[in-house]
Amino acid sequence: MGSPTWLQGEKSSPNARGQHSPGFCPSGPQPCPKPRGPQPCPKPRGPQPCPKPRGPQPCTPALLWAPHRLEGLSQSQDGLLPTSPCFVSGTEAPTACGPCIDIESGSPHRYEASEESSDSDVELVRPRQVKRRRLLPGTVPASVSVYSNKVNSSLKLPPDNSKALLQMSELHSIRGSEDVESEIVPPVTQQKPPTKELTDSETDETEPPNTERLRTGSPSPPPTPKTPVRRKGRAYNKIREMDARLRDLGTVLSPGQKVTTEENDVIVVGSSPAPELTVKVRRGGKLFRINLAMWDPLEKLAQSMASQLNVEPSRILLLLGDEELNKSQTPKSMNLTVADIIDCVVLSPPDGQEDSDPNEKICIKVQGKEKQSHLSVMVGKVEPLQSLMDQYQAAMGLTKKHKVSFFFEGQKLKGKNTAEELGLESDDIIEVWA
């Protein structure tokens, strides 16, 4: 059976793209299968989305229309392809059939199917190229600021104006020159480096220099100027100096205050009492304690002893050890201490001097070996001591058979001796040996 005329004319004539007609079999000398005739494509199940293409590749109409290319495609994954080869007339123009569907994975050929009728022709559709960004591993995508205009509109940085900084430095130099004499040094404020304002447009006008704005932007506000207080302080120092001079002048011109001050000084100096020393004076076996100032002469000590011994002060002799003391000396000049003892001796009256009171009596103490044998006897100065001996023997119960001896300063006494002869005075002690 011969081939049809429409197939014979297209077996050896390639199309404009260099591809063969649908009836031509490019695989070899084998004869192409006889087409059964124009048969309609089966109705597809519905529009199915095209799977993601591997790349933009153009569809080939000749290969898509070839019947031998469409054979054996019934076992496709989508299940929408016909089981027999489709015949498409080369004289009819292709129309839109429906969504583009991949014939097989990895194949660049597509066709569209219409849902309205199964008689619609298969049409080649060029897929739309999708712009995709491919990032290699290890690369970081460039960040794009979405709200750049918002940030620039809200961000207000101080302008890069050197005039404002010059004005601030001049202001500080002027204030520093005014306060050179003051001792208080104002704290140094740290100035921030000038920053630039970031804007999209190049025609933005720079803001005028604003000193107050720079001050408010600092972390700690600078202290208020204290120039008036310092001026007042200098005036106050002048006033204090004048007051001091007036006080000095008043002190010079007011003698009353000076006299009062001197009197107060005298009172303070004389208020402390003079130191005193207790001087020990020994007369016979008796010890006298007399208070004497350190600057008083020993004459006062002699007068005190004369009053206690009922004798004249001229008859008092003071001895320190074996040395006779001058009555004009003082305890301070002699460096006397509490441990020193001064001996007192009563001198006999000079010859030819009559006693003023011959009947004067004195008290003499008589002491035996026992402590209980103690007796005080009143005798006259010119009276013999025999009466004293008799009173003592009678008081102690001693008879004439007992041998009794009386001694005064190691000297044995006799009955005819008198107190005046022996220099006896009141409170002198006579020892008794029985």
Curated annotation (Swiss-Prot):
Keywords: Coiled coil, Cytoplasm, Nucleus. InterPro entries: NFATC2-Int_DNA_Repair (IPR052324), Rad60/SUMO-like_dom (IPR022617), Ubiquitin-like_domsf (IPR029071). Its main location: nucleus. Residues 28-59 have a biased composition (Pro residues). Disulfide bonds: none annotated. Residues 228-237 have a biased composition (Basic residues). Residues 275-351 form the Ubiquitin-like domain. Gene3D superfamilies: Phosphatidylinositol 3-kinase Catalytic Subunit, Chain A, domain 1. Residues 1-63, 176-237 are annotated as: Disordered. GO terms for cellular component: cytoplasm; nucleus. SUPFAM superfamilies: Ubiquitin-like. It is found in: Nucleus; Cytoplasm. Regulates the magnitude of NFAT-driven transcription of a specific subset of cytokine genes. This is NFATC2-interacting protein. It comes from Xenopus tropicalis (Western clawed frog).
